[in-house]
Amino acid sequence: MKATGIVVEYNPFHNGHKLHLNKARELTQADVVIAVMSGSFVQRGEPAILPKWERTRMALAAGVDMVVELPVSFATQHATIFAEEAVRILDAIHVDTLFFGSEHGVAEDFTLAAKKVVDNEARFDEAIQLALVDKKTSYARAYTEAFKKLFGQNLLDITKPNNILGFHYALAAQKQNPSISLQTIPREHAGYHDEEANHDQIASATAIRKLILAGKLEESSHYLPASSIAILRNYEGPFLSWTDYWSFLQYRLIQAGSEELEGIRGVSEGIQNRMQQAATKAQNFSDFIELTKTKRYSNARLQRTALQILLNARSQTSSPYIRILGMNKTGQQYLSLHKKNISLPIITTVSKAPAGLLEEELRATNIYTLAKGLENYQAGDFHIPPILTL
């Protein structure tokens, strides 16, 4: 069976995702499409708008054959680690092709850029450090400056959000298994972070979340496939944002000592002190970010750091594993054919997982379900089995 892998958040699953999924299957001639999906919290450092099990249902209803959870310790980090670990899982599960959307739209250029970085790794790392020192800027900007300086302006624009992820997928594939084929299609209509829905059928997930959180579910339905609309209408829980977790973060920052927070993943350069001061003044999470931000810390980095503090995520990360959130019959058939040759632990029943392997994931789910209205999902990792569809 020819397998294509995609890396997703489906926050929520919308028409753009449906287009991407259909193209992945069509252009790669895949027998099975496997999605590695973020769980309770996503890469921008915020809670998913609805639980991972509902988003898994959306994925399966739209045609994904298997949904594998990207562990929270990787799903909530910067693009390098996010991509490395997603590719590690897809490689372990033996996909032939990694398919992604990008602003650039030419897969060969991503591969070429990745090869150049791998072949010039020492020079590239040195250029990043020089940019950090000389310009006192964020790591992301220093990375971009170093890339432009060494490889020119025209190879690949890694200031674009989907190009960044695509580049890091390509880089991870070069380092882990260069035989993985890369394919990409240009993103259509909506930009990744566009906050307004300006097209008849395609809008960014950001714009769709904005509509849903404003109570405009029916208006958002223009941008969602019928299967997603049905799941959203039947969902009885709340639609979530940082608003639902601000008081928990505020308490955590106020009660913790500065030295205690130094050991949290992503905390550096004394940023915890600014965060603790802001926590006593801010009225909400948006205020908190405004009071905390500096030239060296982008909003996304601040959100990720705040999330690691909320989750009490220590500097070490968990070991990778393959945790199945859901499958259809094709996905089940594929897993049955390949499971003996998969090197990572395969988890379908959480209670049978190796001791300690899921500790961070379980804690993240428990914190996520503290939000009012999620009582039915509490301890869901134990009582909600993988979703199996016909």
Curated annotation (Swiss-Prot):
Where is it mostly found? cytoplasm
* Keyword list, A-Z: ATP-binding, Cytoplasm, Ligase, Nucleotide-binding, RNA-binding, tRNA processing, tRNA-binding
Q: Which GO terms describe its molecular function?
A: ATP binding; ligase activity, forming carbon-nitrogen bonds; tRNA binding
Query: EC no.?
Result: 6.3.4.-
Gene Ontology biological-process entries: tRNA modification
Gene Ontology, cellular component aspect: cytoplasm
| Gene3D superfamilies in the cross-refs | HUPs
| UniProt xrefs under InterPro entries | Rossmann-like_a/b/a_fold, tRNA(Met)_cyd_acetate_ligase
The reactions it catalyses are:
cytidine(34) in elongator tRNA(Met) + acetate + ATP = N(4)-acetylcytidine(34) in elongator tRNA(Met) + AMP + diphosphate
Where is ATP bound in this sequence? 7-20, 101, 162, 187
- Cellular compartments annotated: Cytoplasm
Q: Indicate the family of this protein.
A: Belongs to the TmcAL family.
Q: What does this protein do?
A: Catalyzes the formation of N(4)-acetylcytidine (ac(4)C) at the wobble position of elongator tRNA(Met), using acetate and ATP as substrates. First activates an acetate ion to form acetyladenylate (Ac-AMP) and then transfers the acetyl group to tRNA to form ac(4)C34.
Identify this protein by name.
tRNA(Met) cytidine acetate ligase
Recorded name of the encoding gene: tmcAL
